[in-house]
Amino acid sequence: MGLRKADEKDITLIQKLAQSSWRSAYPSIIPVEQIEYMLKSMYSDDEICNHMKNSDFHYFIIENNKQEPVGFIGFEHYFEADTTKLHRIYLTQDAIGHGFGKEAINLVKDHTLSTLNKRIVLNVNKYNPALKVYQSQGFHIIDEIVLDIGNGYVMDDYIMEYIF
C-alpha cells in the first residue's frame, strides 16, 4: 500500500480512476446523467491541469501492494485561512474497505500539519457511505449546503471538518 505524488502524466489515470469510482459508487445516490455531467466538468484535462499548476493543490495516486493504482486524492492547502480542503478522495470498488482511504486521509493530515493549517474541510454527499469513514477519522459535520452546479443539477452535501 502506498501513495505517490501525481503529475501531469497521471491526468488520464486520475480521470479513469474517477470514472470507475463514480460509476460504481454514485448511481444509487445521484442520477447517472448527473454523474456524467460532473465527471466531464470536474475531471477535464484543463481542470486537473489547472489544479496541478497551483503549488498548494496536490494529487496523490493510491496504490495497492502490487503498485497498481486503486484510487487518488486531491487536496489544497490555504483554501481558506488556516484551512486545507480535501477536494477529492476516490477508490476503485475493489479497494474499498482495505485501509486505503484511511491511509490517504492520514497523508492529508500529515501534509496539513506541515503547513501549520489548523483544520481540514471537505464536502460529502449526504447519502454517501463514506460519511462514516470520515467520522471514524475524526471529521465532524459542521454545516450542510446545496450547491447549484449547472445543467439543473445540485450537490446536496454536508461540510465536514477535522481540527488539529
Q: What residue ranges belong to the model's regions?
A:
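Accessory recognition modules or surfaces
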Residues: K102, V154-I163
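Conserved glycine-rich acetyl-CoA-binding loop
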Residues: E68, R88-N106, N125-K132, S136-Q137
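Short coil/turn segments at alpha/beta junctions that flank glycine-rich nucleotide-binding fingerprints
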Residues: H98, T115-K118
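Conserved catalytic-core motifs of GNAT/GCN5-like acyltransferases
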Residues: V121-N125, Q135, H140-Y158
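Acetyl-CoA-dependent GNAT
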Residues: K5-I11, K16-D94, I105-H111, T115, ...
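Extreme N-terminal starter segment of soluble prokaryotic enzymes
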Residues: M1-L3
